[in-house]
Amino acid sequence: MAAKLIAFDEEARRGLERGMNQLADAVKVTLGPKGRNVVLEKKWGAPTITNDGVSIAKEIELEDPYEKIGAELVKEVAKKTDDVAGDGTTTATVLAQALVREGLRNVAAGANPIGLKRGIDAAVARISEELANLSKEVETKEQIASTASISAGDPQIGEYIAEAMDKVGKEGVITVEEGQTFGLELELAEGMRFDKGYISPYFATDLERMETVLEDPYILIANQKISNNNEFLPVIEKVLQAGRPLVVIAEDVEGTALQTLVVNKIRGTFKSVAIKAPGFGDRRKAMLQDIAILTGGQVITEEVGLKLENTELDMLGRARKVVVTKDETTIVDGAGDASAIAGRVNEIRAEIERTDSDYDREKLQERLARLAGGVAVIKAGAATEVELKERKHRIEDAVRNAKAAVEEGILPGGGVALLQASIAAFEKLELEGDEAIGASIVRRAVEEPLKQIAINAGYEGGVVVEKVKSLEPGIGLNAATGEYTDLFKDGVIDPTKVTRSALQNAASIAGLFLTTEAVIAEKPEKPAANNAGGDMGGMDF
């Protein structure tokens, strides 16, 4: 086992703080509408230029073992805030830095870290309540567009996201893909999309786009492999007599069954497409059942006594259109009963509430989105690959940001909500001793995001903070224009969830810093001595 380094008390905490400061100082220059960019060197390929806090944080690796741990703890704040809300990473980092700086100063002066932590937690809880009181529900498409525009730093992206959410609903899927042209495109699929394409390219009906488009098809949904023609032909004959195309979604289609479909497609006698079922094991069963409910069909499986050769037309699903590419399938306007779909949606929601696994929750949410909403695809194009990656990442963040706004409402942006919520919160907060000192640490820390936004925009941070304290709630500095205005009217807004998550996650990590009494780190290994002699005595190799 490798040797360890151990540091105690002040030495331990200061080591962590140095690491945190290096990371936070690199990240906080990006805050606000006038935030600067940071260039990230890559081992391979061109460097990346970004102003996304979490991307910058991920790149920072420090040499000193204690500093490295400090930086990693703050990375966790940024990552957690990004995962939950899609934005607010830089705000969370700035808050964490301010809380730790003020907290460690008080610990060094003799304050009890546990008392400080209790005070910090009490103040954060009160401010979170005040944020909820200040919050307004998202009522218009324009508000969604404003929120997403601020996150992405581009009004056009905001408009496209608002349009997409308007079409697919708050639980609908909005995906971001790389487009083939400059600018943005929005495609809508009012149905279900999953990541499995046709088994054979011979099924393509549009050879230019290499996709299969079938209008008003029957859909055979089978939780089994289909390889034997004897059991499969009765189904094909019934569909052929009905004069409709056939979509087969099964564990696999192979052998003579696949040959029959391909040969008839090439001859033009019968349009069809075979698709492998999405997922594995129990998840595949559940997804096939989702497809069956959406299309009004049944899952053909011997587990429930349904055999392929006995399948009738009324057991097959229906849809207005099915589009299949080599990678994905989109079912548009399934013929399923609305009440059955609603029942299935409620069932999945209940499962989401019950599960403890993050992975299961994510997969259940994907299933919920496929059933409850449609699918919107935003295609982004750019001049260079570096620009394209950065733009795609910004759009993905902005989508999560817009969904957070719909979920919990919106607040005045620009760091103003935290400051104004804290003024109201501290009027009602009665603490004593070290707890009161802990609360005062939070009071000073919540000024930092506004201060940093002002500094990045070229203003004097302290002056701006004092000015905003004297203004009515909702009035603050619009750093893009340099004017003090009604931020809701100007569209300078942040999702409540983003601001709340940033504060709570920052306070959580600050508490860990303050109550740390020892740090145990890996001892850096010395580089191995070079055994080869400097002079090889004229030897040839």
Swiss-Prot record:
Q: Which GO terms describe its biological process?
A: protein refolding
Q: Which GO terms describe its molecular function?
A: ATP binding; ATP-dependent protein folding chaperone; isomerase activity; unfolded protein binding
Give the subcellular location: Cytoplasm
Top-level EC class: isomerase
Q: Which domain of life is it from?
A: Bacteria
Matching InterPro entries: Chaperonin_Cpn60_CS, Cpn60/GroEL, Cpn60/GroEL/TCP-1, GroEL-like_apical_dom_sf, GROEL-like_equatorial_sf, TCP-1-like_intermed_sf
Q: Name one Pfam family in it.
A: Cpn60_TCP1
**Description of how the protein assembles with itself and partners:** Forms a cylinder of 14 subunits composed of two heptameric rings stacked back-to-back. Interacts with the co-chaperonin GroES.
Protein name (record): Chaperonin GroEL 1
Annotated organism of origin:
Thermobifida fusca (strain YX)
Record lineage: Bacteria, Bacillati, Actinomycetota, Actinomycetes, Streptosporangiales
